[in-house]
Amino acid sequence: MTKIQGIRSIRVSLPFETGGPRHGMRPSLDAWTKMESVMVRIKTSDGLEGWGEAFGHAMAPGSEAVINQILAPMLVGRDSVAINHRIAELERPLHGLGRSGPLMYALSAIDTALWDLAAQRAHLPLYKFLGGESGVLTKYASLMRYGGDTDAVAQNVERARSYGFKTIKLHETTIPAFRAARNAVELDDKICLDVNCPWTVAEAREVAQEISEEGFHWLEEPIWPPEDFEGLAEVRLEGVPISAGENITTLHEFKLAMETEAIDNLQPSVTKCGGISKMRKIISLAEVYPVTVIPHCFYWGPGYHATAHLAASCLIPTPLETAFITFAVEPHKLFDSCSDQLTLDDTPGLGFIANWDELDKFIISTDEVNAS
């Protein structure tokens, strides 16, 4: 039995530049200046290290606490090979902590790290271990929110196009900003609208009606609460393709979203829903519904690598979301916001090799639980 010898959490807060005015995606993030990641490193008795990432951002303290205080003490000394058994035996007894939120984010990190280890033992990059053939991916640029500043929107859309991006996502919430982006690109370019759950169903329908003939590629999470699938289905009737899924975690809810015909694009997040194991089940489940799986990926740590490998393992080419920002230091060689292409090499596992010489100074906290 290959045992888990140690689990370390590393919380990093990495400063970035947006290329425009700073506005958070939500009211609690008025001026977003740093992107937090909660990484997990699992060491095993065969001398390997596996990496995973829990959803961070404003949720980082909660994800970190669950890893350090609950999951790590329960897992150290256990078998690292039986991935499904490890996660299932934790998810059920801990369900009192919720079926979403920090518990699932923390489990996502653990699960991903265990898959990293499994692929390393098979001497395969994760995407090949999952059945993929090509490690070449097309990315799409995911812009920050510029507070409705139409000049900043147009300038950054044009800048993204200059790097080769043909699909660009906004995080604005106003129609003038939407149109500024649409007018800054060619007809065959795709503009996506991620509005982060700001509207009622009636408000979202009104917006969708107004922009329905303007060729936007999708409207993402237009209503609150995000799990109101019947409401999403109503908005979808206005003719704009609907995307959602980053705030769904259970298979039951993913199935309900598709059965309700609420969405066109399903966007599960590997750092939120339960890691590689749950993502594989979601992708398989979606095959029998008329939806396209496009994983959410607004992060830069091992979760970025995991999403890339999952995208490369899909039968249908899947674009990789990449935050269109400039970090204070290069976190690792795979993250490049100035290129619309990414190629995974043949390094076994995730291939996550962080630039710790530069990242060390941005570590907020770290903790480790080891076998006695």
Question: Which residue ranges define each predicted feature?
Answer:
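Flexible C-terminal active-site loop/helix
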Residues: T2-Q5, S9-V12, F16-G19, W32, ...
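Active-site mouth loops of central-metabolism enzymes
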Residues: V136-A152, V195-T200, S243, N247
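Catalytic core of soluble alpha/beta enzymes
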Residues: L170, I175-P302, V329, S337
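Metal- or metallocofactor-binding catalytic centers and their adjacent structured scaffolds
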Residues: I7, K43-R121
